[in-house]
Amino acid sequence: MGRTLESKKQIVEELKALLDQAEMALVIDYQGLTIKEMSDLRTRLGPSSGICKVTKNTLMRKAIDGDTSWSSLESLLNGTNAFVLVKGDVGGALKAVQAFQKETKKSKTKGGLFEGKLLSQDEIKAIANLPTKEVLMAQIAGALNSIATKMAVGINEVPSGLARSLKQHADSGEN
């Protein structure tokens, strides 16, 4: 038995709400995946605030209709699609999807949309390979700390160098 018009409208509204919160959308061909494997993917996406939704392309088309930030997804809406909507850690979600695909070898990423730009396979891989925000912040903090340390050593070296020069001059004057 098919869905009623009312339930379809409710699904479209739910998709619109998810898209409003999402920073990125990833379109995956899920053909051949079992329910258990889809549950595994959803579990993996949890820590990165990603959601995996399987819905008809026509319902997703209605959800993005008139929304310029998501309208580029239109070109990916064919075949059997699962939509990964990420509202948190984009890199973490992409890494989770890639690890899942590597293990199952059953699904492939058709493309994605990030900040209104359609992403190719290579661009998606590049984003997934970026370090996490925490790692980047640690690297920046380390770089700033090393600059401060080098400045302190440099500032301390001026009087020390002067003292060594004076001592050397005084020692040479005694002879």
Curated annotation (Swiss-Prot):
GO terms for cellular component: ribonucleoprotein complex; ribosome. Coiled coil: none annotated. InterPro entries: Ribosomal_uL10 (IPR001790), Ribosomal_uL10-like_sf (IPR043141), Ribosomal_uL10_bac (IPR022973), Ribosomal_uL10_bac_type (IPR047865). This is Large ribosomal subunit protein uL10. The keyword Ribosomal protein applies. Transmembrane segments: none annotated. Part of the ribosomal stalk of the 50S ribosomal subunit. The N-terminus interacts with L11 and the large rRNA to form the base of the stalk. The C-terminus forms an elongated spine to which L12 dimers bind in a sequential fashion forming a multimeric L10(L12)X complex. It comes from Prochlorococcus marinus (strain MIT 9211). Forms part of the ribosomal stalk, playing a central role in the interaction of the ribosome with GTP-bound translation factors. It comes from the Bacteria. Pfam families: Ribosomal_L10 (PF00466). Belongs to the universal ribosomal protein uL10 family. GO terms for molecular function: large ribosomal subunit rRNA binding. CDD domains: Ribosomal_L10. Keywords: Ribonucleoprotein, Ribosomal protein, RNA-binding, rRNA-binding. The keyword Cytoplasm does not apply. GO terms for biological process: translation.
